Design a protein with these regions (language model features):
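FAD-binding core/adjacent interface of flavoenzyme oxidoreductases
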Residues: 40-45, 52-94, 98, 157-236, ...
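Rossmann-like dinucleotide-binding cores of NAD(P)H-dependent redox enzymes
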Residues: 130, 139, 236, 245-301, ...
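FAD-site-proximal beta/loop scaffold in flavoenzymes
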Residues: 213-232, 311-313, 318-388
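Beta1-alpha1 glycine-rich phosphate/pyrophosphate-binding loop at the start
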Residues: 4-22, 81-165, 252-273
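Residue-level detector of alpha-helix initiation sites
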Residues: 103-107, 129, 201-203, 222, ...
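Short linker/helix segments within small regulatory modules
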Residues: 21-36
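Mid-to-C-terminal Rossmann-like scaffold of FAD/NAD(P)H-dependent oxidoreductases
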Residues: 74, 79, 87, 92-96, ...
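Short, non-ligating residues that shape and space the ligands of small metal-coordination modules
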Residues: 15-16, 48-51
Length: 477
């Protein structure tokens, strides 16, 4: 049986399991899945899936668990070392490959490693419960009437058993002893042969005075469960942040029957990602559905007004009443553990063309990573990096190759696809009407297209030809 990966959101269709909730029985081959079937999480079609695995359904060879060991005291370098220009691999010890983080990148790397080696010992440390879920689905799960249990696909124990690895949930890694290849964790010391930092990214918190108990973020399944609980008996939701995630949540909440106000610093929604005309069109579509806007503004203070509602004091002096504030102002890579270990860090943990950090034994993967093309927060480049990193960890040295992949913004009221322009890129937008839809390309002064945005239902079919126009150099690892 085969497994198919949605390159947009990371959902996996397993032929052995099918998708019974959509009437697709277990054992249904991909070619027999209806052509009009859509990804349950991001609503793209079958064309945006690619095969990632072929299994014969035979159990893998049992792996002998590696026990935690205690070694000498940690010795950390005083400064970060530069990235190696070429990968160097020390000989394997009997200690496991250790992955810190059980999000999409950490889990998928464990899957890739196990698919290539039935015997290599693999250990995963995670600060949460280690449950598997699709993070991109968090911002559109309400409209699909999915609670936390519906989003969870497996518990840590289930995927630990299925992959024949070791998972330590609710365990924090406090320090990396690079000299002795040892982790200091909340449950003791643990040796590794090679280490992968898949520590993810956390919500940015802006300073807000007053009662912050009304303010929350949704960045993982635990957050989402709490969010669903907080939404009970609530009606008026203020979203702080007018970017991609803020707009997705606005669409999701308004379609679920809530009153929504979006507060953001931009002159138009998603100002950093799309040009003015497209932003205005997106704003109009959401406004027509009932979303209200307070742009070029932010929250200065929150004061409780009753047991279940608050008044938001904006920087402009405007006041808004709300029952809950969802903060969606952006993410910051989790780099503190890498910094403490003396690894080279910029906006994210810096890696070379093999996913290797400035320590030859330590790799990094996911939205904590910064390549020579910048921070990589989107799921498509993460998916493209995983196979190469897995091979390099197993001594099959393989450079990462990133190909252009769009970002599908989950705003079904007005579909939007973008290929983000790199920060500080020089150039300008050129916009064209395609009937009621809009297309926009961002071109350098030399006429090279560096990014694009497609707004509207009909132009979504144009993603492939627009991707072909992108500069390969812009997207190479």
């Amino acid at each position: 049986m085969k497994k198919w990966l949605c390159i947009i959101c990371g959902l996996i269709y397993d032929e052995a399991q099918g998708w019974p909730s959509d009437g697709i029985a277990p054992g249904t081959a991909w070619e027999d899945v209806p052509d009009d079937w859509l990804c349950p999480d991001c609503l793209v079609g079958k064309a945006d899936f690619e095969m990632i695995d072929i299994t014969d359904d035979a159990p893998i060879e049992e792996v002998t668990a590696v026990s935690s060991v205690s070694v000498g005291s940690a010795v950390q370098p005083n400064t970060a070392q530069p990235l190696p220009s070429e990968v160097t691999q020390p000989a394997f010890s009997n200690d496991p490959i250790v992955i810190i983080g059980s999000g999409h990148s950490g889990y998928q790397l464990a899957v890739a490693l196990r698919s290539q080696s039935a015997t290599v010992p693999i250990t995963v440390f995670t600060a949460d419960d280690g449950a598997l879920y699709s993070k991109p689905a968090l911002s559109n799960a309400l409209a699909m009437n999915k609670g936390g249990d519906a989003l969870q696909s497996e518990s840590a124990l289930e995927w630990e058993s299925r992959l024949n690895i070791r998972v330590y949930p609710h365990t924090r890694v406090e320090q990396i002893d690079r000299a002795n290849l040892t982790l200091h964790t909340s449950i003791g010391k643990y040796a590794y042969s090679r280490l992968v930092l898949a520590t993810g990214a956390s919500p940015i918190e802006i300073p807000i005075e007053g009662d912050r108990s009304y303010v929350m973020s949704v960045n993982d399944l635990v957050d989402y469960r709490r969010f669903r609980t907080q939404l009970q008996d609530k009606k008026r939701i203020a979203i702080l942040g007018d970017g991609l995630i803020g707009c997705e949540f606005a669409n999701d909440l308004i379609e679920s029957g809530y009153e929504v106000t979006v507060i953001g610093l931009g002159k138009w929604p998603m100002e950093r990602l799309i040009p003015h005309q497209l932003g205005e069109s997106l704003q109009s579509a959401l406004t027509d559905r009932g979303v209200e806007w307070a742009l070029q503004d932010s929250i200065a203070r929150v004061d409780a007004m009753s047991e279940s509602s608050a008044v938001l004091h904006l920087n402009s002096g405007k006041q808004i009443e709300a029952d809950l504030v969802l903060s969606a102002v952006g993410l910051k890579p989790n780099v503190s553990l890498a910094e403490l270990a003396g690894l080279e860090v910029g906006r994210g943990i810096k890696v070379n063309q093999f996913g290797q950090t400035s320590d030859e034994n330590i790799y990094s993967l996911g939205d904590c990573v910064e390549t020579d093309q910048g921070w990589q927060p989107y799921i498509a480049p993460i998916n493209q990096m995983i196979p190469s990193v897995a091979k390099s960890l197993l001594d099959d040295i393989t450079p990462i190759s990133l190909t252009p992949t769009p970002v599908i913004v989950k705003t079904p009221l007005l579909p939007l696809t973008i290929f983000p322009v790199a920060p500080n890129a020089q150039g300008q937008w050129y916009i064209e009407h395609q009937g009621d839809d809009l297309t926009a390309g961002f071109y350098s002064p030399e006429g090279v297209m560096l990014g694009f945005a497609l707004l509207g239902r009909q132009v979504q079919s144009l993603r492939a030809p627009w991707l072909e126009q992108l500069s390969f150099k812009q997207t190479a690892a």
